[in-house]
Regions:
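Charged, glycine-rich active-site and insertion segments that engage polyanionic ligands
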Residues: 1-39, 92-94, 100-256
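Conserved alpha-helical scaffold flanking the Walker A/P-loop in AAA+ ATPase domains
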Residues: 6-7, 46-66, 71-74, 78-86
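Loop/turn-to-beta-strand initiation segments
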Residues: 61-66, 91-97
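Structural motif
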Residues: 19-22, 44-47, 68-72, 99-101
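AAA+/P-loop NTPase substrate/partner-engagement loops
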Residues: 39-53, 104-106
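A generic short-segment signal for beta-strand/edge and adjacent turn/coil regions
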Residues: 84-88, 216-217
Length: 256
């Protein structure tokens, strides 16, 4: 992580954008950045992006040196535009650290006004070294970062693989009500005995595209596009289970 901050550790930019896949170490890098300056306090404001908050005295005229962090991948375009308020006449006491899973998640106006750090992709052999479960081949097909590997190590990947395989190969004959029960197997909020939502999306995406390359089936392509849309929308809403069930409904219809 040190290589990413070598050029800025003597003069910390007021806005830093860190881009990297989930589990790539964005927050570890953020913690290192926070050690570079004597901040009075740090605050995650991802869930507080409103005009009222951004115009508040606390933000516009801070009396302490503060670091605000924001996950742009969880913000709508409208919220990102609101965030630009902080770039107009920034206080010398205010610092921003912005996270994004990909460049596509970030408005160009934010990107150009920030110091950009893009975390390199991890080599396959480096990831393989981190795997402690017996499902090495399956994990390496869907996990690209140490954080994803960590979750996979504590997941029954064989069972997840089988569930996603059934969603691809047997959805044509599946009963609608049975299809909806898939949502009961996904962790939407601290239900760690269930499948991680992001890992599920990665696995189903892998299975859909593998099958599509073999069959060129249009229904598989439609189902994959529905999954991509889910991955864009679900991180922006509070009621993730409801959003997921809407996806299952559209996914089921794609095979009809």
């Amino acid at each position: 992580m040190d290589k990413y901050i070598e050029n800025i550790k003597e003069d910390l930019p007021h806005s830093i954008l860190i881009i990297g896949e989930r589990g790539s170490g964005k927050h570890k890098l953020y913690n290192k950045l926070c050690e570079l300056k004597n901040f009075n306090y740090t605050m995650d404001i991802t869930d507080r992006i409103t005009k009222e908050f951004l115009n508040s005295e606390e933000i516009q005229n801070p009396v302490n040196i503060i670091m605000l962090s924001v996950d742009l991948s969880k913000l709508t375009v409208r919220q990102q535009n609101m965030l630009l308020k902080l770039f107009e006449e920034p206080s010398k006491y205010l610092y921003l650290c912005l996270f994004a899973d990909s460049e596509a998640d970030v408005l160009e106006t934010i990107k150009t006004r920030s110091y950009n750090i893009v975390i390199d992709k991890y080599a396959r052999d480096a990831l393989e070294y981190l795997i402690t479960s017996n499902n090495k081949n399956i994990i390496l097909e869907v996990c690209n970062t140490p954080g994803q590997i960590e979750i996979a190590n504590h997941t029954d990947m064989e069972a997840l693989y089988k569930m996603c395989e059934n969603m691809v190969k047997k959805m044509r004959v599946a009963n609608y009500q049975n299809a909806l029960t898939i949502s009961n197997k996904i962790n939407f909020s601290d239900e760690y005995d269930k499948y991680d939502l992001f890992l599920f999306i990665k696995m189903l995406s892998y299975k859909l595209m593998t099958e599509f390359y073999e069959t060129q089936s249009k229904e598989l392509l439609y189902a994959y596009l529905e999954l991509k849309e889910l991955n864009k929308r679900i991180w922006l809403v509070n009621n993730k289970k409801q959003q997921f069930e809407r996806f299952i409904s559209r996914y089921w219809k794609a095979f009809r």
